[in-house]
Amino acid sequence: MSKPFYVKFEVPPELAEKVYEAVKKARETGGKIKKGTNETTKAVERGIAKLVIIAEDVDPPEIVAHLPLLCDEKKIPYVYVPSKKRLGEAAGIEVAAASAAIIDPGGAKDLVEEIIKQVQELRAKAGA
């Protein structure tokens, strides 16, 4: 199945797992996250997001299509995960989350830094 048009680079499954773990760990260890596209968009516009996570299975895709462009404009790293349902679970909500943002990584600081480094390498390879 082809990726939606807003997915600018391929994220390996191992990295996606680390992302779910980082969201959950940040939430559970005194960090701060934003859940959902409205909150995520505001966090990016305010320049307070450390890492933005965008689900690949969002329908319609236009809901999150603006996020990669906005993140690039604000120089905020972003990463894709395959499942909005798992992203919602990692964020601690009962419903799916099309996107989320880590504002303060809390105890997931090292994990978030590692993810950002891997994302930069993936984007460089993909020319994204």
Curated annotation (Swiss-Prot):
The keyword Nucleotide-binding does not apply. One of its GO terms (molecular function) is rRNA binding. GO terms for biological process: ribosome biogenesis; translation; tRNA 5'-leader removal. Its main location: cytoplasm. Transmembrane segments: none annotated. Keywords: Cytoplasm, Ribonucleoprotein, Ribosomal protein, RNA-binding, rRNA-binding, tRNA processing. InterPro entries: eL8/uL1-like, Ribosomal_eL30-like_sf, Ribosomal_eL8-like_CS, Ribosomal_eL8/eL30/eS12/Gad45, Ribosomal_eL8/Nhp2, Ribosomal_eL8_arc. It is found in: Cytoplasm. SUPFAM superfamilies: L30e-like. GO terms for cellular component: cytoplasm; ribonucleoprotein complex; ribosome. Pfam families: Ribosomal_L7Ae. Belongs to the eukaryotic ribosomal protein eL8 family. Multifunctional RNA-binding protein that recognizes the K-turn motif in ribosomal RNA, the RNA component of RNase P, box H/ACA, box C/D and box C'/D' sRNAs. Part of the 50S ribosomal subunit. Probably part of the RNase P complex. HAMAP family: Ribosomal_eL8. This is Large ribosomal subunit protein eL8. It comes from Staphylothermus marinus (strain ATCC 43588 / DSM 3639 / JCM 9404 / F1).
